[in-house]
């Protein structure tokens, strides 16, 4: 099973099962997300799951589904019907972390609603409970905002798309885009909630905003731009005028009205300051505010957005660059620590709650091997075993600091994932390994060898669920993208680069 339960006590014999879901009960003395799955070990021989809440029951049912033959996971047909023989056993289980997340970038490549719902369903099957939805970026905008209609008329489409990770003149000469209606996103929220997944929207600001500036040039610093067609980080950022701050608040209001969860992402990452340094208006604002430099202005902006979300009864969630704001960084902001391992430690030591999602362990756009047929290889090699070895809580923290690490998250950046099929390939089976890390490895069965043995069995479940996962033997010839060149790096080079980047946190 994946994730492996904490305790399995096996009995003698088998239970004859005719229904795919057991009887369910709530016992509030259990952990809220914990459960006990009793498969025929009690005197009455009944299969039952007892959870600390409806969440616990749901996770117990997911475990029970893995006790049935993989064919039972198919949607219909005689192969999906019982009866089945299941070994007698008693399983006791509960997660290690409250936040077990996966981030999906739908800005770089738009994912149609049915594919997005399927992505959620697969995450829930693996007991993940947060979908961080990256809705906006330089290359596309997916969130409707009534007061700013051009966002879903102009900002949601780019004229063409760069092929590969190397900057060159090779493009797919076809427009790409789309957006979700309010009804679409409400369906996403409802669908996820039934599977005990909270959707956390992210609207990246004040950088990663070229698509919005293409739709409303007055938000920028004077340059006339189109929605970005190449990959990378745009130097075109928001200008931080009063009108632009109002735009940002309107966008957060729109997210608040659709997504009921506690957190709303504001990004805060990778914001070049070139335009701010050259802008008389921005420099005048800095002077009025008494701020010494552009980094301080960035921190002030983050504080403005966090204050607005707090007024709505929500908490801001952002990338670890936000920590560079120092004392200006709002104490209640949740940090997504991505630039290597160190930012998780820094955030916790400074008293911030933090979600560990370091690129070197949890970025699923990174290539899966050195094989020449890996599609558009970027980043360092990140194998299934590398993901499984990830420890979200860094060494060297006190007990109180360790508690600040509320969970872990895998990030699926889609610059080079043009379809749901490609997302499957890059996500699975590595997300299976990550799910077990986030749920908490069983002390008795947490070895790489044990996990790999279970993963070989688990691939039959992925087959039944229709997942286009990367084969354990390696990429197949049809997985290659010779038309879309990658930009691979060694792990040493990546770590060195991140060490340079996080100098702003020291």
How should each PLM-predicted stretch be described?
Residues 1-98, 316-325, 329, 457-464, ...:
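Acidic, contiguous N-terminal accessory segments
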Residues 193-194, 253-260, 307, 311-314, ...:
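Generic secondary-structure signature for well-ordered alpha-helical cores
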Residues 315-323, 328-333, 337-506:
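Flexible, acidic glycine-rich loops studded with aromatic residues
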Residues 112, 177, 181, 240, ...:
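Residue-level preference for long, well-ordered alpha-helices that form the structural scaffold
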Residues 7-11, 30-263, 304, 308, ...:
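Feature activates predominantly on carbohydrate-active enzymes
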Residues 212-218, 222-333, 338-351:
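Active-site neighborhood of glycoside hydrolase catalytic domains
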Residues 110-112, 138-144, 206-212, 265, ...:
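Flexible loop/turn segments at secondary-structure boundaries
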């Amino acid at each position: 099973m994946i994730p492996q339960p904490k305790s399995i006590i096996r009995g003698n014999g088998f239970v004859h099962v005719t229904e795919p879901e057991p009887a369910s009960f709530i016992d509030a003395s259990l952990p809220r997300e914990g459960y006990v799955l009793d498969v025929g070990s009690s005197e009455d021989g009944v299969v039952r799951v007892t959870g600390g809440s409806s969440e616990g029951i749901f996770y117990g049912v997911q475990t029970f589904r893995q006790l049935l033959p993989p064919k039972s996971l198919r949607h219909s047909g005689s192969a999906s019907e019982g009866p089945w023989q299941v070994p007698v056993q008693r399983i006791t289980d509960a997660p290690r972390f409250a936040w077990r997340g996966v981030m999906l970038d739908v800005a770089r490549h738009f994912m149609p609603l049915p594919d997005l719902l399927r992505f959620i369903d697969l995450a829930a099957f693996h007991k993940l409970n947060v979908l961080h939805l990256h809705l906006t970026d330089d290359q596309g905008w997916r969130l409707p905002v009534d007061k700013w209609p051009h966002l879903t008329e102009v900002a949601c489409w780019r004229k063409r798309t760069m092929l590969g990770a190397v900057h060159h003149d090779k493009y797919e000469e076809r427009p790409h885009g789309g957006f979700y209606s309010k009804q679409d996103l409400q369906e996403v929220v409802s669908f996820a909630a039934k599977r005990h997944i909270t959707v956390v929207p992210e609207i990246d600001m004040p950088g990663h905003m070229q698509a919005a500036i293409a739709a409303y040039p007055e938000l920028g610093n004077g340059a006339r731009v189109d929605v970005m067609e190449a990959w990378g980080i745009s130097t075109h950022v928001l200008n931080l005028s009063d009108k632009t701050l109002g735009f940002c608040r309107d966008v957060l209001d729109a997210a608040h009205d659709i997504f009921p969860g506690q957190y709303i992402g504001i990004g805060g990452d990778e914001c070049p300051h070139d335009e701010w340094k050259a802008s008389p208006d921005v420099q005048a604002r800095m002077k009025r505010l008494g701020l010494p430099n552009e980094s301080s202005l960035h921190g002030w902006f983050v504080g403005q957005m966090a204050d607005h979300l707090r007024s709505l009864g929500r908490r801001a969630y952002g990338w670890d660059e936000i920590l560079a704001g120092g004392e200006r960084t709002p104490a209640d902001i949740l940090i997504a620590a991505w630039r290597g391992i160190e930012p998780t430690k820094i955030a916790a030591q400074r008293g911030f709650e933090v979600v560990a999602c370091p690129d070197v362990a949890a970025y699923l756009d990174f290539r899966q091997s050195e094989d020449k047929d890996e599609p558009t290889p970027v980043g360092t090699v990140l194998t299934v075993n590398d993901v499984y070895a990830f420890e979200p809580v860094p060494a060297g923290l006190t007990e109180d600091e360790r508690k600040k690490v509320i969970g872990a998250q895998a990030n699926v950046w889609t610059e080079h994932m043009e379809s749901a099929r490609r997302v499957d390939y890059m996500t699975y089976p590595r997300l299976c390994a990550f799910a077990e890390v986030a749920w908490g490895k069983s002390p008795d069965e947490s070895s790489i060898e044990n996990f790999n043995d279970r993963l070989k069995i688990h691939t039959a479940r992925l087959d039944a669920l229709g997942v286009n996962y990367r084969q354990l033997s390696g990429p197949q010839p049809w997985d290659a993208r010779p038309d879309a060149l990658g930009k691979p790096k060694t792990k040493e080079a990546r770590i060195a680069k991140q060490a340079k980047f996080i100098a702003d946190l020291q």
